[in-house]
A protein has these predicted regions:
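Basic, polyanion-binding surface patches
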Residues: 1-197
Length: 197
């Protein structure tokens, strides 16, 4: 079956892509404005390059058509902290996807503990295994639509000591949660690559 995306509705496009581009890592993004901490998850999230270290997140709009707080805060303050989600944080991450009023904080609403590691960046979520401290690189204009891709420079990376199994080789292990359609999944069995012929 062929789906013509020029004819399909926006909801159809999302359903098709969200269920076939899988699994998708989740960026649990922390931003801050005038003392209010905003936390929201985004699964349109990829690493663009390790040199220069850059990632991309795509941020939509609120139900009333205005910019989500994450987008507004990054546009204004040029900073964010991206936390990687593991199974232990699944519930609170999911709850933080609910739309709140602009001056409300998911941190207080859902009892999400944060800790400030660097003064120049928003705090990270205390319980996560890994966090990226980022600043704004550029916004990509897709020529309309409801989603705004943001390219972010990764300036510092935090990894919990207990998740670094080999410090010399920088070998890191944790149990990430991925997005598949409207559901979540863990990675499960690790597959070993076959030897090249």
């Amino acid at each position: 079956m062929i789906f013509n995306l020029e004819d399909n509705t926006l909801n159809d496009k999302y359903k098709l892509m969200a269920q076939t581009i899988i699994p998708r890592p989740i960026a649990w993004v922390v931003t801050e404005d005038e003392g209010v901490i905003n936390i929201a998850p985004f699964s349109y999230f990829i690493g663009l390059s390790s040199n220069p270290a850059t990632v991309l997140i795509s941020v939509g709009h609120k139900s009333d058509g205005t910019a989500k707080d994450t987008l507004a805060n990054i546009r204004k303050n040029k900073k964010c902290t991206i936390c990687m989600v593991d199974k232990a944080n699944l519930d609170k991450m999911h709850f933080s996807s609910k739309e709140l009023a602009h001056n409300s904080s998911e941190a207080s609403e859902y009892n999400i503990e944060t800790t400030r590691v660097f003064e120049l960046f928003p705090p990270m979520i205390e319980s996560v295994p890994c966090a990226y401290f980022c600043d704004f690189n550029q916004e990509i204009d897709l020529g309309g639509g409801d989603t705004i891709p943001l390219v972010l420079n990764v300036r510092k990376i935090y990894v919990k000591d207990e998740n670094i199994v080999d410090k010399e080789r920088i070998s890191i292990e944790f149990d990430p949660v991925a997005r598949i359609g409207k559901s979540y999944a863990s990675l499960g069995e690790e597959l070993v690559a076959p030897k090249m012929p």
